[in-house]
A protein has these predicted regions:
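Hydrophobic alpha-helical membrane-embedded segments
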Residues: 115-144, 219-228
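Core segments of transmembrane alpha-helices
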Residues: 94-101, 174-195
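Membrane-helix interface/capping segments
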Residues: 133-167
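Interfacial segments of alpha-helical transmembrane regions
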Residues: 115-124, 198-219
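Membrane-interfacial loop-to-transmembrane-helix junctions in polytopic alpha-helical membrane proteins
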Residues: 78-89, 111-117, 202-209
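First transmembrane helix
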Residues: 86-108
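Cytosolic/stromal cytosol-facing helical appendages immediately following the last transmembrane segment
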Residues: 1-85, 146-147, 163-174, 201-203, ...
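Membrane-helix exit/interface motif
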Residues: 104-107, 162-169, 187-201
């Protein structure tokens, strides 16, 4: 089980403020008297306005009402009736393909190849975790919400998420997962086609690869749902809490590290397995330095500018 680096010598922030990563406190099992989940998580990030790392992001409190107003007026929900229909169709198709592929895999699995299959499945999960981190890092770090199409529809939700982290918990299953489910459909459909059309020998030749793709697709599809669970502090099913505590999926306490301003670490949000090793390798900071040196673009240069405009 991978645990947050609250005592790591190279993470002075979490070491100096261990109380921010505690799940128990004098005010109750979560240590809070917050009236909403949004207050709860924002207070975790901004308990000490004088903290040097949080001072530059202190306006997150001031802009909390703005985000709530946007949510109440539907601004945060960029979708339309057509978008909702597309999401429903994609979720239905994806789940059907997953079930069909699962039964094909069970039917064709061979015990003598089980170890190879398990390794392939594990690699699929790790790939999904890295992919979630790469997308999350890119959206948090680069670009402006003013960009045509991309800014409004892709970057802005990531920036708003840092101001109102629990807004994701107010989305239903379809809205949360529709886009990710859509991404996996071509790959799952190709798997079904292979199982239906290839001979048994050819199926076995591609079986390890298909197991890798299946677990990759499954965890990519569920990334937003897992992320949503990591921000849900009340009413989670027991089996979800168990998966979080065993770090099979992203734990709440682990993901909280990312939500400490300036949101520059722990980007992987599927399982979170890669967050600690990538941080030890300084992967993201080195990548940012290379990009800045090459292009002259500064990471997170656009951060919070959009919110200050009050639009």
């Amino acid at each position: 089980m991978v645990t947050p680096r609250t005592n790591s010598p190279d993470n002075s922030y979490t070491r100096e403020h261990p109380e921010r990563f505690s799940t128990a406190g004098p005010a109750g099992p979560l240590g809070y008297a917050a009236d909403t989940q949004a207050d709860l998580l924002l207070d975790l990030d901004l308990q000490d306005p004088s903290d040097a790392r949080n001072a530059s992001r202190g306006s997150e409190r001031a802009h909390r009402p703005l985000v709530r107003e946007r949510a109440s007026t539907g601004v945060l929900r960029q979708g339309s009736g057509g978008k909702r229909t597309q999401e429903c169709i994609c979720v239905g198709i994806c789940m059907t393909l997953m079930v069909v592929n699962f039964f094909f895999i069970i039917f064709h699995v061979r015990i003598d190849n089980l170890s190879t299959i398990l390794v392939a499945a594990f690699c699929g999960i790790v790939t999904a975790d890295f992919g979630s981190g790469l997308v999350h890092w890119a959206a948090d770090t680069w670009g402006s919400v003013e960009l045509p199409i991309l800014g409004k529809n892709f970057l802005r939700p990531f920036r708003e998420h840092h101001i109102d982290p629990t807004s994701i918990t107010r989305h239903d299953f379809i809205e949360t997962n529709g886009d990710n489910f859509m991404v996996t459909i071509p790959f799952l459909a190709r798997m079904v086609w292979d199982f239906l059309t290839l001979s048994e020998d050819d199926v076995q030749k591609k079986f390890t690869w298909n197991c890798y793709v299946f677990l990759l697709a499954l965890f990519v599809a569920m990334t937003n749902q897992i992320h949503k669970w990591s921000h849900t502090y009340f009413g989670l099913p027991g089996w979800v809490v168990w998966l979080q505590e065993c770090h099979v999926i992203l734990p709440r306490r682990h993901h909280r590290i990312h939500h400490v301003a300036p949101h520059e670490t722990y980007f992987c949000i599927t399982t979170g397995w890669l967050n600690w090793p990538l941080e030890k390798l300084r992967f993201w900071s080195i990548l940012e330095a290379v990009i800045e040196q090459t292009t002259g673009c500064k990471p997170r240069a656009d951060d919070m500018k959009w919110a200050q405009k009050g639009t």
